[in-house]
From Swiss-Prot:
It comes from Oxyrrhis marina. One of its GO terms (cellular component) is nucleus. InterPro entries: Meiosis-expressed_gene_1 (IPR020186). The lineage of its organism: Eukaryota, Sar, Alveolata, Dinophyceae, Oxyrrhinales. Residues 28-45 have a biased composition (Basic and acidic residues). This is Meiosis expressed gene 1 protein homolog.
Length: 120
């Protein structure tokens, strides 16, 4: 076993790499898919299926369905006879999957957390 040696370069000891990754993720703006910025925002006051989908998207880090579609494509949904809600999303921050139930998850106590954005 002569002549065999382990060589190489050690990992960098600075925080340079995580900053580069953070910069790549932050290049993406929180605007709508076509670059529009929201002109106003309201909080949800009553539950609807649209509010449910918005709740699921916002818990994954997105402002709107347009923003999600631009990054990952159309989200998977439960069949219409089961409500047609979003069944699986990916997190905006790292791409991990989030699986959602077939029925309502946005309880009344969470309604005020849901933001409805309006674009002109």
């Amino acid at each position: 076993m002569d002549g065999l040696a382990i060589g190489g370069v050690s990992a960098p000891m600075t925080a340079e790499r995580p900053q580069q990754v953070k910069k790549q993720l932050s290049r993406r703006t929180p605007d709508a898919a076509d670059g529009r910025k929201p002109t106003r925002m309201e909080r949800a006051k009553a539950w609807t299926p649209e509010i449910e989908d918005q709740f699921r998207l916002q818990n994954s880090g997105f402002k709107s369905l347009d923003e999600y579609v631009d990054m990952y494509g159309e989200p998977e949904r439960w069949p219409n006879e089961l409500g047609g809600f979003i069944s699986k999303t990916q997190l905006k921050s790292n791409g991990y999957f989030v699986y959602w139930r077939k029925f309502r998850e946005c309880e009344d106590k969470h309604l005020a957390q849901v933001k409805i954005y309006y674009y002109d």
